[in-house]
Amino acid sequence: MKVYCLLLVFLVGLVSQAHGRLDKRCMTVCTMEYWPVCGSDGKTYPNKCHLTSTACTSQKDITVLHVGKC
């Protein structure tokens, strides 16, 4: 029983650590410059940085369709 508890604690720690790395990789500080881009999800983003940040944090493949509003 102790072995299972230790294994569970280890696995929870491992998953938490992996989740923390994902969040850090996605943290992006974007400027407030307004150079709108249209994303492949049909949304207009203030600039490419905001689109990239959203794609990373949502874990979706969002690309720039064109420069300007959708």
Swiss-Prot record:
PROSITE patterns listed in its UniProt record: KAZAL_2
Ranges for domain Kazal-like: 21-70
Signal peptide start-end: 1-20
Gene Ontology terms: cellular component: extracellular region
Keywords: Disulfide bond, Ion channel impairing toxin, Neurotoxin, Protease inhibitor, Secreted, Serine protease inhibitor, Signal, Toxin
CDD domains: KAZAL_FS
Disulfide-bonded cysteines: 26-56, 30-49, 38-70
Entry-linked InterPro entries: Kazal_dom, Kazal_dom_sf, Prot_Inhib_GrowthFact_Antg
One of the record's GO molecular function terms: serine-type endopeptidase inhibitor activity
Keyword Disulfide bond carried by entry: yes
Site residues, Reactive bond: 32-33
The organism's place on the tree of life at top rank: Eukaryota
Known tissue expression: Expressed by the venom duct.
Annotated compartments: Secreted
Gene3D superfamilies, A to Z: 3.30.60.30
PANTHER family: FOLLISTATIN, ISOFORM A-RELATED, FOLLISTATIN-RELATED
Annotated family: Belongs to the conopeptide P-like superfamily.
Function of the protein: Acts as a neurotoxin by inhibiting an ion channel. May also act as a serine protease inhibitor, since it possess the kazal serine protease inhibitor signature.
Protein name per Swiss-Prot or TrEMBL: Turripeptide Gli9.1
